[in-house]
Amino acid sequence: MEVIICSDEQAVGRIAADRIAKVLGRAKAPVLGVATGSTPLTTYSSLAALAAEGKADFTDLRAFALDEYIGLPADDERSYAATIRHTVTEQLGLDPANVHTPDGMADDLDAACAAYETAIQEADGVDVQILGIGANGHIGFNEPTSSLSSRTRVKTLAERTKADNARFFEEGEKVPSHCVTQGLGTIMDARNVVLLAIGANKADALAGAVEGPVSAMCPASVLQFHPHVLVIADDAAASKLTMAEYFRWTDSQRGDLSGAM
């Protein structure tokens, strides 16, 4: 893993966007894996700024979302399809036909999950997968005890995850209990992964993912087995990393060198 610790959320987004754009720029038919939530928002706005400045071209970019609530249609503003439409498709000027989200309204959810896996494979896989991390260590909606080799499937959300996501719903609205999510095995198939962490409430989870044992109790820890992972965190999220000073030192000594990202 390469770990970069930043002073604030804006710096996280700028650095992530720069590294992501470089990888996508090298790909013949670029594919980006996109996440929802508040964490990647500065990354998306920074990617849009790079495009506006002529430093990146996303004309032919294809995108696959990590997950979707079951029971919310794509035109429901609370759905992840709507979130991705606003934060990614419109902001980056993508062709809506090139942006895919899991189908949480399918009559046959198992078939829809299999079809989503096939669509990713037919796109020749994901060049860069953007991830946030939940306070309980989940990535996508892979909650603790998820199989480390899991594929796209239906999952039940943990109560903590529902409570964390309640801020995206109006007061009194019920947060869905079920979702379709890419599995940990699906995520691990991406050629590069960028894990973003912002805020002190993510500190324990990030420490477990980066420095803890690989365990289904911290799903993000499976990323320790991935050959090309870039972790970008702000000071607060990195506050419980025992190797934080080492990560800062290596970053200061890197110069023009970097990993696959």
UniProtKB/Swiss-Prot annotation:
User: HAMAP family of this UniProt entry?
Assistant: GlcN6P_deamin
Entry keyword Hydrolase: yes
What are its E.C. numbers? 3.5.99.6
Q: Output the NCBIfam families linked to this UniProt entry.
A: nagB, PRK00443.1-4
Transmembrane regions listed in the UniProt entry:
none
Known role: Catalyzes the reversible isomerization-deamination of glucosamine 6-phosphate (GlcN6P) to form fructose 6-phosphate (Fru6P) and ammonium ion.
What is the species listed in this Swiss-Prot or TrEMBL entry?
Answer: Cutibacterium acnes (strain DSM 16379 / KPA171202)
User: Which Pfam families does UniProt cross-reference here?
Assistant: Glucosamine_iso
A GO cellular-component term linked to this record: cytoplasm
Gene name, per UniProt, is: nagB
- Biological processes annotated in GO: carbohydrate metabolic process; glucosamine catabolic process; N-acetylglucosamine catabolic process; N-acetylneuraminate catabolic process
Tell me the route in metabolism or biology where this protein functions: Amino-sugar metabolism; N-acetylneuraminate degradation; D-fructose 6-phosphate from N-acetylneuraminate: step 5/5
Class of the enzyme per the UniProt entry, highest EC level? hydrolase
**Gene Ontology molecular function: any one:** glucosamine-6-phosphate deaminase activity
What is the name of this protein? Glucosamine-6-phosphate deaminase
